[in-house]
Amino acid sequence: MSKPIVMERGVKYRDADKMALIPVKNVVTEREALLRKPEWMKIKLPADSTRIQGIKAAMRKNGLHSVCEEASCPNLAECFNHGTATFMILGAICTRRCPFCDVAHGRPVAPDANEPVKLAQTIADMALRYVVITSVDRDDLRDGGAQHFADCITAIREKSPSIKIETLVPDFRGRMDRALDILTATPPDVFNHNLENVPRIYRQVRPGADYNWSLKLLERFKEAHPEIPTKSGLMVGLGETNEEIIEVMRDLRRHGVTMLTLGQYLQPSRHHLPVQRYVSPDEFEEMKAEALAMGFTHAACGPFVRSSYHADLQAKGIEVK
C-alpha cells in the first residue's frame, strides 16, 4: 500500500502528483490514444511577442498571477498581445484538484494583504478599461476568499474609477452565506461563476463541487442584485452530449443567468482527463442559436472561447468565437 502524499505548504502539485490525490482515478492517456486536433483547433502565434513579455514582466514585478498562465490557456498569446489578462488573486495554489484544470493543487500560503493595492496599481498602469478578477479555490479560508475579492474591487475602483470589473468566483462551498454577504455589499459589474460541465459527469470532472450548489450561488447573487448580469461557462468534449449541454443552459436561465460562454475542452497533460471529442464550429453555432432563443442576452460559443476570453467584448454583446 503506497503512502499518502504529505503536502508541504506553498508547494505546487501538478500533473501526476495532483491526480494521485483525486478520489475518482483517471487513466493516463497514452500518446497513441490522443485524439488528433482538427484543423480548426490550430493556433497561430503572433510574430511579435513584445506586448506578451511586457505583461508577464508587469505581473512578475508585482508578484501577481494570471489564470492565463497558471491554467495554460490556449488564448494566452492572443489576449496578452492585445493587452488584456485575467488576474488570479489569492495565490497560485488551489485547494481543489479538478482533473480538467492545470492550476496547481496544494496547501496555499496565507493571502497577501498587499495584493489588492498591487493589483490596483498594475491595472491603473496598464490603463485597462475592463478587467476580470478570478481566484483559486481557498477552502482553507473561513469566507472562501470573498473578503479578498471585495478588497480588490474596492482598491481597483479607487485607482480606476471608470473601470468595469468582472469577477469569476469559486463556489464558496460550505461558505455561501458568509461569502454572499460580503460580495453583495461590494458587487462587481458582472458576476461570473462557471458550471463547467453537465451533472451526469460532475463527480468525475469537478470532485468537491456540487452542480446545484453552483446554480444556487448564481441565483442568490442575482436575487440580491437583479441589475447586475450573471454569467457562467461550460466546456464541451468531456463525454457529455449536446442535449445535456442544452439542458444545463436551460437550468442557467431558470436561475437568472443571462450571459453564457461555451468552449472546447483541451487536455493540459496526459495525466488530465482526455478529450472525448472535438466539437465543430457549426455545432457551436447551433448551440449559440439555442442559447439566444432561450433568452441569454450574450452567448459566446466557439472552440477557443473561454470564460474570460475577450470578456470586454462579451459584455458589450459583440460576437466572440
Swiss-Prot record:
Primary enzyme class: transferase
Domain of life per record: Bacteria
UniProt binding sites for [4Fe-4S] cluster 2: 94, 98, 101
Name of this protein: Lipoyl synthase
HAMAP family linked: Lipoyl_synth
Catalysed conversion reaction: [[Fe-S] cluster scaffold protein carrying a second [4Fe-4S](2+) cluster] + N(6)-octanoyl-L-lysyl-[protein] + 2 oxidized [2Fe-2S]-[ferredoxin] + 2 S-adenosyl-L-methionine + 4 H(+) = [[Fe-S] cluster scaffold protein] + N(6)-[(R)-dihydrolipoyl]-L-lysyl-[protein] + 4 Fe(3+) + 2 hydrogen sulfide + 2 5'-deoxyadenosine + 2 L-methionine + 2 reduced [2Fe-2S]-[ferredoxin]
PANTHER family per UniProt: LIPOYL SYNTHASE, LIPOYL SYNTHASE, MITOCHONDRIAL
Source species: Escherichia fergusonii (strain ATCC 35469 / DSM 13698 / CCUG 18766 / IAM 14443 / JCM 21226 / LMG 7866 / NBRC 102419 / NCTC 12128 / CDC 0568-73)
Predominant location category: cytoplasm
Domain Radical SAM core, first and last residues per copy: 80-297
Pfam family name, one: LIAS_N
Pathway stated in the Swiss-Prot or TrEMBL entry: Protein modification; protein lipoylation via endogenous pathway; protein N(6)-(lipoyl)lysine from octanoyl-[acyl-carrier-protein]: step 2/2
Protein family membership: Belongs to the radical SAM superfamily. Lipoyl synthase family.
Enzyme Commission no: 2.8.1.8
Gene transcribed to yield this protein: lipA
Statement: the UniProt record of this protein carries the keyword Iron-sulfur: yes
Cofactor note: Binds 2 [4Fe-4S] clusters per subunit. One cluster is coordinated with 3 cysteines and an exchangeable S-adenosyl-L-methionine.
